[in-house]
Design a protein with these regions (language model features):
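Conserved alpha-helix/loop element of class I SAM-dependent methyltransferases that forms part
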Residues: 17-35
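C-terminal lobe and adjacent flexible extensions of AdoMet/dcAdoMet transferase-like proteins
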Residues: 200-248
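SAM-dependent methyltransferase
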Residues: 136-210
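A short acidic, Gly/Pro-enriched loop at the edge of an enzyme's catalytic core
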Residues: 94-101
Length: 248
């Protein structure tokens, strides 16, 4: 278990998963996707999976962290929604059949360790994608890593949890940012317990991402500036890619 698993929901309270699901649903309809079997890849604690299930999708959700999935299963118990959760690394995805739509949200692909692993993950999605099916994902851009995360430090004060997020831009070909988290959780006696963790995120230019999609056997349908239907810009901090598996 990584410490992010324990604090994930509290540190992402600013995210409206309902809005995220509605945005992805809009893209699915716009690009001719079927409202049928949907895979939520790297689903985390299942908040987005829950929203897709409420919208009528038949949802399968995977994550490499059993701790995250335990939180997701707690939500499933409360909601009663028929979501199937599987503990799988996205580079080793293994489905029982083909999937109509795969969603990978909240820059999950950026958390992979290398370009090779990113290609493996995209290849796996393509392998299990129904012909005519879609793969929609968002990623942080090299621009964001170089100019926004860069060498900056961010602080999150959430009453019972205090988080210091420190970035170090490595300047490597994969625009790697090394991230250090220091999380302080308030105990019942008012004192704080400190937890620490280090991890990295990688990012690639739009053209490189498009090459990886094409190498998997899928086509690039569109690339949008994050959370819009606007085209990608050179200063986009996040991009949304829509890929499709050809019918033949």
């Amino acid at each position: 278990m990584c410490i992010r698993d324990s604090f994930y929901d509290r540190l992402t309270l600013n995210i409206s998963y309902k809005d995220r699901a509605e945005y992805f649903d809009r893209l699915i309809k716009l690009h001719g996707g079927r409202k049928n079997l949907l895979l939520d890849l790297a689903c985390g604690t299942g908040s987005l999976s829950e929203e897709f299930a409420k919208m009528g999708y038949d949802v399968i959700a995977t994550d490499s962290s059993q701790e995250m999935l335990n939180c997701a299963l707690d939500k499933k118990f409360e909601s009663g929604l028929p979501i199937q959760y599987l503990c799988q690394d996205m580079t080793e995805l293994d489905m029982f059949g083909t999937i109509d739509v795969t969603i990978c949200a909240l820059d999950s692909l950026n958390h992979l360790s290398s370009k090779e692993d990113m290609q493996k993950a995209i290849n796996k999605v393509s392998l299990f994608c129904e012909p005519g099916g879609l793969f929609i994902f968002d990623v942080n851009t090299p621009y964001k890593h170089k100019n926004i995360l860069a060498e900056n430090t961010y602080v999150y004060d959430l009453d019972d949890v205090y988080c210091v997020w420190q970035n170090s831009f490595a300047g490597t070909p994969d625009s790697r940012v090394n991230i250090t988290l220091d999380i302080f959780e308030r105990d019942d006696d008012g004192r704080f317990t400190r937890y620490g963790e280090e991890f990295s995120e990688i990012a690639f230019e739009k053209s490189v991402m498009e090459e990886m999609i094409k190498a998997s056997g899928m086509t690039v349908e569109a690339v949008y500036d994050y959370d819009t239907l606007d085209p990608a810009r050179t200063d986009s901090e996040k991009l949304v890619f829509v890929a499709k598996k050809p019918l033949v």
